[in-house]
């Protein structure tokens, strides 16, 4: 049995999340650090919503599918990415029900944190926005680049991963989630 790079990276992120979750003071300090990066509430109010399942369904999935269809990459069907989004949504919903005790940063109303409205208090783990954008991005990358070597593959993959990670981290920047939730 071989383990691919994405599985190994996922295991590393999972281990890191468990480590951070076991040290709440570290989660709070990381929240303060990332929250200090909020340079525009208007920008982040929209940017963080890129990970929303409906926005992914309406914009991200069609753009990724169209891009893979119109270039030399493998064509990734919209239906495939929609199914991935639905499966991720169901898994996140189940995990949120199982971890309903997890509180969001808004529960504590920390004084030196700039919260972006609306402020929710519960169901922090996992971040649905982060799971959706990262899941769809990684599935698209693995299908679009399977067996293909193009000159710009590294650049395209890096841009898609950068966008997915930026949207995921924006959930911490707007104080909707802890870093260990994403």
Each language-model region and where it sits:
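N-terminal transmembrane-helix/juxtamembrane module of multi-pass inner/ER membrane proteins
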Residues: 1-59, 96-119
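Membrane-embedded catalytic cores of phosphoryl/pyrophosphoryl-handling enzymes
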Residues: 2-3, 113-182
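Alpha-helical transmembrane segments of integral membrane proteins
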Residues: 4-12, 76-84, 152-159
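Aromatic-anchored segments of alpha-helical transmembrane domains
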Residues: 15-21, 86-93, 162-175
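Membrane-water interface at transmembrane helix exits
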Residues: 31, 64, 92-100, 141, ...
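Hydrophobic alpha-helical transmembrane segments
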Residues: 50-68, 129-137
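Interfacial segments of alpha-helical transmembrane regions
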Residues: 62-94, 157
């Amino acid at each position: 049995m071989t383990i691919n790079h994405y599985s190994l990276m996922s295991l590393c992120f999972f281990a890191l999340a468990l480590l951070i979750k076991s040290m709440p003071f570290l989660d709070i300090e990381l929240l303060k650090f990332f929250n200090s990066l909020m340079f525009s509430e208007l920008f982040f109010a929209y940017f963080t919503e890129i990970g929303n399942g409906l926005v992914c369904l309406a914009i991200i999935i069609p753009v990724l599918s169209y891009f893979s269809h119109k270039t030399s990459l493998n064509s990734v069907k919209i239906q495939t990415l929609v199914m991935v989004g639905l499966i991720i949504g169901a898994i996140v919903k189940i995990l949120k029900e199982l971890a309903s005790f997890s509180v969001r940063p808004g529960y504590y109303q920390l004084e030196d944190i700039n919260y972006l409205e609306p402020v929710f208090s519960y169901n922090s783990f996992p971040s649905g926005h982060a799971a959706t954008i990262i899941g769809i991005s990684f599935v698209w990358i693995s299908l679009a680049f399977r067996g293909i070597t193009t000159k710009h593959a590294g650049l395209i993959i890096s841009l898609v991963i950068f966008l997915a990670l930026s949207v995921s981290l924006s959930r911490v920047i707007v104080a909707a989630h802890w870093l260990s939730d994403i």
